[in-house]
Amino acid sequence: MKIAVAGTGYVGLSVSLLLAQNNEVCAVDIVPSKVEALNRGESPIVDEKITEFLYKNTTGECPLNFRATLNQSEAYEDADYVVIATPTNYDPMKNYFDTSSVENAIDAVRNVNSAAWVVIKSTVPVGYTMNLRKSRNDDRIIFSPEFLREGKALYDNLHPSRIVVGAPADDSQAIAAAENFAQL
């Protein structure tokens, strides 16, 4: 399975490495130094398991099918799934989530790949994914919340207390895609 991941923070990088054990994963970021570090096998974030996985990948002890890139089109064009793990800043004074990074990532995916399933892992408000599916007339978007601790993100992905992937109850294709993603 070919999977692209938008964002290489705690959520994006941990899910990338988890999935790269059995899938071809390409992580996308907009920060050149992060992409370069990842491709050298160095973690740009503090997480013991992420550091260990990247190191073991470079030594061949634990080979991963993982690479990072700045080129969104290259990453997204042949992907079966694209995981969106971009930042969504919440302003408690305005009670507002800035979801523009999620929407921009989905736009970049759809510019080159209309068939990929988009899996939102970013923190978004309740009902956001359903509203996005309707407003964009795009039924290939599903949601999978993250339950990760900072600094323990990969460990938490490797040993999940639960796996949740949401899809509309009346959309059998989305349900099948969600079930498939949960098994990856």
What are these regions (language model features)?
Residues 77-81, 114-116:
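Short acidic/histidine-rich motifs immediately flanking catalytic phosphotransfer sites
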Residues 82-84, 120, 165:
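Redox-cofactor binding/interface segments in oxidoreductases and associated redox assembly factors
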Residues 131-142, 149-184:
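Internal alpha-helical scaffold of NAD(P)-dependent oxidoreductase catalytic cores
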Residues 90-153:
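Rossmann-like NAD(P)(H) cofactor-binding subdomain of soluble oxidoreductases
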Residues 86-88, 123, 169:
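Short glycine-/small-residue-rich Rossmann-like dinucleotide-binding loops
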Residues 1-44:
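NAD(P)+-binding Rossmann beta1-loop-alpha1 motif at the extreme N-terminus of oxidoreductases
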Residues 49-79:
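A structured beta-alpha segment of the ubiquitous adenosine-cofactor-binding alpha/beta core
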